[in-house]
Every structure is written in C-alpha cells, then in structure tokens.
C-alpha cells in the first residue's frame, strides 16, 4: 500500500463515464464465490454511506476489474464492475448474481491483470478496452470467510478509497514522505521520538470502541500534546500528519465498512499491527524500525484520530476533504492551546506504563 496514491489518479479519472446499466434476466455467469464477493462489496459500500462513515464515497460505483484465482493463484474468471465502454465478449450478470451491481463477466484480460498485479493483490491503472481500472484478485479462502479482518473486500475498499484522495480531496500543505534511493523510509527514530510514538499507540489500542464525547476529546488532547511534542523535537515529524491523512482515512473506511458484516471481528481494529512492546523481537534492524514507525503505524493512528473526531461530533469528512489532517482537525475540535501540551502529555504518561514504554523504545533504538 506504500505507493498507491501516486498511481491512482488515472484509474478514477472519468469514472462517471461508465456505460448505461442494462437490465437482463436471470444469468449463470458466476459461481458462489463471485456472488459473495459482489454481495460483500455492495453491503460494505452501503454501510460506509448509510452509517455516515464517509458519505461521499461509494466504493461499488467505481470502475473495477476483479479476478478470481484458484488456491495456487492461477486466474480463473474476470468481472468488470461499472465498465467504461462496451467490451466485446463481455456478458452482463443478472441481479440474481450481481447483488444489483453493474457487473459483466469478461475473462479476456485475466492473465494480463494477474501479470500486472504480480506478487501483490492489486494494481491501479489496469487497461481494459483502452480504459483504466483498479484490479484486484480474490479467491475462495479470502471471500468465503466470517472474518472482518482477512476478507478481500477490506483491501478493495481501502485501495479504491485512495482514488478519492487523488481525484477529489484537497491535499494538505504538509509534505509527503520521501524514499531513499533504495525505496526505504527516511524517518527519525531516535529513542526520544520512539517513546512518544509508542505512547500514542498505547493510547489508541483497542479502537474502535465505545467512548463518550468527553472521553474522545480528552484522548484527542493527549494525542495533540504528544504529536506537538514530537514536532518540537524534530519538525520532520510533520510528514506523519500527511501519512495519517492519506493512509489513516483509508484504514478508517475499510475497518468501519466491514465492522457489521462479519461475525468474527477480532483483529478488525485500527491498530492491527503487532503491539509495539513486542516489536524489539521481530524488528531486527534500524531500517525495519524506521519502516514500521515511519510508515506502518500511521495507518492505525490516523484512523484512530478520525474515529475519535467522529465520537466528538466533528464533521471530519468535510475537514479531511478540505485538506485538514487528522492532527489539525483534532486541534480544532478540542480548541487546543499550546499551554496545555505539558498537562496532557503528563496525563498520557501517567495513564500508561511510561517506564515500560521507555524500555521498549530503548531496545528498538539500539537496533543497528
């Protein structure tokens, strides 16, 4: 998911130019796995809109080419959702198979799609009949599942949402994160900064969960105090705000969109990466530490802040779409003052095991 925003503009450009929906009778172009994939997409899209998770985003209305694969990854069938042109050889699915979506069976590009995706699960700007689509694979195991965390629909909603970033949203003034010549993350991971990062990861652990408006505002103030302190230590940390705006919003949408669809909700939390206090065992080099704490953690922290903004009654959709980062929005809704930094930073340290946090940060900072 590291590079998707850079390449998603073309895929959504002209997404309103799909061919008119044609009504057909009962069809037999799909199997149970396919039908479940379409049903999941429809339910998730409806959930995102109807629950006010993100009422300007309808995932099921975007141009998508889905490829079903077997358990070895070999492509078996392809389906164009919301085709942008009349594709020769494509067959329209009836409502008995499509869950009411505009879906066409088209196997003519399944191998090309799989080649473009390669060892990943998805790709942007895949060309079908001269038009650009988001493409993704799915299979029986990641479709016929009761897990809100491991189903393929979760990834689909996340990645398609990135098209909204590129096509509609105003980008924040903060800079994106650059990569070095080897494609690695360049992010400060001093012991002092790691302590503060782990502190807000502990603060957000277990979200989304029910909190009152006053609790949400209090947690947001602690977060703002921590991030403001990070920035005062190293202004480069401002780039985390952009990351929370881009990846955090997509993480929020994918998590909330699947929240009520599956019986098994374990791991369907914003901070689904391993607990930071055990990472000194699994992260072996400083490069790995920088990659995790300079990129991965902002998916969950951004989503957590947006969840708290929602609980505080703030119009986060409008703010994010106008280019405010979650950090900036949190400062607005809490009416945060710089004089409160030491107060809420101290509260966060007292509420969580600060000595344990310091020891974890020490171990991580000593990686070579």
Report each predicted region and the residues it spans.
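Active-site recognition of the HExxH zinc-binding catalytic motif
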Residues: 154-167
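Sec-dependent signal peptide recognition
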Residues: 1-8
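Long, internal scaffold/assembly segments composed of regular secondary structure
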Residues: 226-333, 337
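Auxiliary, metal-adjacent structural segments of Zn-dependent hydrolase domains
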Residues: 19-23, 37-138, 149, 174
């Amino acid at each position: 998911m590291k590079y998707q925003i850079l390449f998603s503009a073309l895929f959504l450009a002209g997404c309103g130019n799909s061919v008119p929906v044609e009504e057909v009778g009962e069809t037999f172009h799909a199997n149970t796995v396919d039908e479940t994939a379409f049903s999941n997409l429809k339910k998730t899209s409806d959930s995102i809109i109807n629950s006010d998770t993100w009422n300007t985003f309808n995932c099921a209305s975007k141009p998508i080419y889905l490829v079903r694969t077997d358990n070895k990854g070999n492509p078996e069938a392809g389906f164009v959702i919301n085709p942008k042109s009349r594709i020769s050889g494509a067959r329209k699915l009836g409502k008995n198979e499509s869950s009411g979506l505009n879906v066409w069976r088209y196997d003519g590009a399944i191998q090309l799609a799989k080649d473009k995706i390669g060892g990943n699960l998805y790709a942007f700007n895949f060309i079908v009949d001269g038009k650009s689509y988001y493409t993704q694979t799915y299979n029986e195991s990641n479709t016929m599942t009761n897990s809100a965390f491991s189903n393929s629909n979760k990834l689909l909603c996340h990645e398609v949402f990135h098209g909204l970033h590129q096509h509609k949203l105003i980008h924040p003034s903060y800079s994106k994160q650059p990569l070095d010549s080897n494609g690695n993350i360049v992010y400060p991971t001093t012991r002092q900064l790691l302590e503060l990062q782990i502190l807000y990861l502990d603060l957000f652990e277990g979200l989304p969960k029910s909190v009152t408006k006053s609790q949400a505002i209090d947690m947001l103030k602690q977060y703002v105090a921590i991030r403001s302190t990070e920035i005062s230590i190293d202004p480069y940390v401002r780039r985390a705000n952009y990351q929370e705006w881009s990846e955090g919003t997509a993480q929020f949408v994918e998590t909330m969109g699947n929240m009520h669809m599956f019986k098994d909700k374990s791991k369907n939390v914003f901070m689904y990466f391993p607990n930071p206090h055990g990472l000194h065992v699994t992260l072996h080099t400083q490069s790995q530490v920088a990659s995790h704490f300079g990129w991965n953690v902002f998916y969950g922290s951004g989503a957590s802040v947006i969840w708290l903004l929602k609980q505080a009654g703030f119009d986060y959709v409008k703010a994010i779409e106008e280019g405010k980062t979650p950090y900036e929005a949190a400062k607005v809704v809490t009416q945060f003052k710089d004089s409160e930094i030491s107060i809420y930073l101290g509260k966060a340290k007292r509420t969580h095991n600060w000595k344990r946090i310091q020891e974890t940060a020490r171990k991580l900072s000593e990686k070579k």
